[in-house]
UniProtKB/Swiss-Prot annotation:
Its cofactor is pyruvate. Coiled coil: none annotated. This is Aspartate 1-decarboxylase. GO terms for biological process: alanine biosynthetic process; pantothenate biosynthetic process. Keywords: Autocatalytic cleavage, Cytoplasm, Decarboxylase, Lyase, Pantothenate biosynthesis, Pyruvate, Schiff base, Zymogen. The modification Pyruvic acid (Ser) is found at S25. Is synthesized initially as an inactive proenzyme, which is activated by self-cleavage at a specific serine bond to produce a beta-subunit with a hydroxyl group at its C-terminus and an alpha-subunit with a pyruvoyl group at its N-terminus. It is found in: Cytoplasm. It comes from Dechloromonas aromatica (strain RCB). Binds 1 pyruvoyl group covalently per subunit. The lineage of its organism: Bacteria, Pseudomonadati, Pseudomonadota, Betaproteobacteria, Rhodocyclales. Gene3D superfamilies: 2.40.40.20. Catalyzes the pyruvoyl-dependent decarboxylation of aspartate to produce beta-alanine. Substrate binds at T57, G73, S74, A75. Pathway: Cofactor biosynthesis; (R)-pantothenate biosynthesis; beta-alanine from L-aspartate: step 1/1.
């Protein structure tokens, strides 16, 4: 059996740009791409915490160390500078691969600088 699982997550990054007229995609600081194991042109899902929008595009590199998260092309209508975003990738794993699988979880500050890395999401406590 194969399962589609979370591969990478950039948690609560801040959109720095929204460029309607740039060729589609989402430009992501190269440091963040490497930390999250996201390849250039890889499909990404973006979830906008501010407005609830969810959309799919692909990643391109932004200047290393810049903190840039630029939502481009038609997707720019779904995010504005200052919006909080979650960027995720998924991959298909077989049962053998699943036994060793841990997603790359990257947490950032308000300037999109890495503050923590992880591989597990804590169990959510009952309210």
């Amino acid at each position: 059996m194969q399962r589609t699982m979370l591969k990478s997550k950039l948690h609560r990054v801040t959109a720095t740009h929204a460029d309607l007229h740039y060729e589609g995609s989402c430009a992501i600081d190269e440091d963040l791409l490497e930390a999250a194991n996201i390849k250039e042109y890889e499909q990404i899902d973006i979830w906008n915490v501010n407005n609830g929008e969810r959309f799919t595009t692909y990643a391109i590199r932004a200047e290393r160390g810049s903190g840039v998260i630029s939502v481009n092309g038609s997707a720019a209508r779904r995010a504005a500078p200052g919006d909080i975003l979650i960027i995720a990738t998924f991959a298909v794993y077989n049962e053998v691969e699943l036994a060793k699988h841990e997603p790359d979880l990257i947490y950032v500050d308000t300037q999109n600088r890495i503050v923590r890395r992880g591989h597990k999401i804590p169990v959510q406590a009952a309210a």
